[in-house]
Design a protein with these regions (language model features):
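Internal intein/HINT superfamily modules and their associated LAGLIDADG
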Residues: 1-285
Length: 285
């Protein structure tokens, strides 16, 4: 019952969210795109799963410009898209926000080149200071975009039930952003991170009980996620609680964690009825 209350409270927060500039900068560094080469029309966009439609509307209200539209991709999947073409809004709102709050080297380089190509008044934007402390709100926005909360279940002979359960917090970035991930791990998570690599991607992972219980859980309890990822976190906390109580070493505890993983999948794709109607309308055009 307490978990359901938390999930419903999280839904209400998303629909009445107060966007902070540092959060938005972190979210843009994870999910934003700067379009248009020199000589082309510049524009900026963010796209998200339709479940985050209300949050995207809050972003459009923050910039006091434009509307969020639903788009259906060639593969049939729908997404909520917010695009800014207005050069005035780009120059007077997007550029100041990003130049003052960006942290990521890769996105900052893209943003810098895009700005130099289209806006004569912004020819000397400095790259972020690698020694500057990261704002917690920036990290929340970045994790709302590129972070993950999940559990791993491995077959093993080391446990009586035949399975080992691990809860994981993960942020994935290109190889070139390992320095940024190290800064995040050292500043916020007590240097408890481990590393994993897949193709050209680095994964900062917190898997130790110390790191999860003493750093990750309290940080995101205090600094709320704004996307549907908050549901992932709340359900992940229940998995972590099961492990803290050593219930995961029993078959009933293992089943509980599997049920919580299924709930995560449900809440990731659960869309309010009004948004579903808009998607259906799009698909039936």
């Amino acid at each position: 019952m307490e978990l359901l209350k938390s999930l419903e409270h999280s839904r209400a927060i998303q629909e009445n969210v107060n966007i902070k500039p540092q959060w938005l900068a972190g979210f843009i560094e994870a999910e934003g795109h700067f379009h248009g080469k020199a000589g082309q029309q510049p524009h900026f966009s963010i796209s998200q799963h339709p479940a985050d439609f209300k949050l995207m509307e809050s972003i459009s209200k923050y910039f006091d410009h434009g509307k969020v539209r639903l788009s259906v991709r060639p593969d049939g999947r729908s997404e909520a898209v917010y695009t800014i073409y207005s050069k005035d809004v780009l120059e007077n709102k997007i550029i100041p926000l990003c130049s003052e709050n960006f942290i990521s080297t890769n996105k900052s380089l893209q943003f810098r080149e895009w700005t130099k190509a289209h806006f004569p008044n912004y020819q000397s934007i400095a790259l972020p200071d690698p020694n500057k402390k990261i704002d917690p709100n920036w990290l929340v926005g970045f994790v709302d975009g590129d972070g993950s909360f999940y559990s791993l279940i491995h077959k093993t002979k080391d446990y009586k039930i035949g399975y080992q359960v691990q809860t994981v917090f993960d942020i994935a970035q290109l190889d070139s952003e390992r320095g940024l991930l190290t800064r995040i791990g050292d500043q916020f998570f007590g240097s408890t991170q481990t590393w994993a690599k897949s193709k050209d991607t680095q994964h900062l992972r917190i898997m130790s009980k110390n790191g999860l219980v003493n750093y990750v859980e309290p940080f995101f309890d205090e600094n709320k996620l704004l996307t549907r990822k908050e549901y992932d976190f709340l359900l992940w906390k229940e998995m972590l609680k099961t492990i803290k109580n050593k219930e995961h070493t029993t078959l009933s505890g293992l089943e509980k964690i599997k049920e919580l993983r299924d709930l995560q999948n449900f809440y990731r794709s659960n869309i309010s009825s009004d948004i579903q109607k808009l998607i259906d309308k799009k698909l039936n055009k």
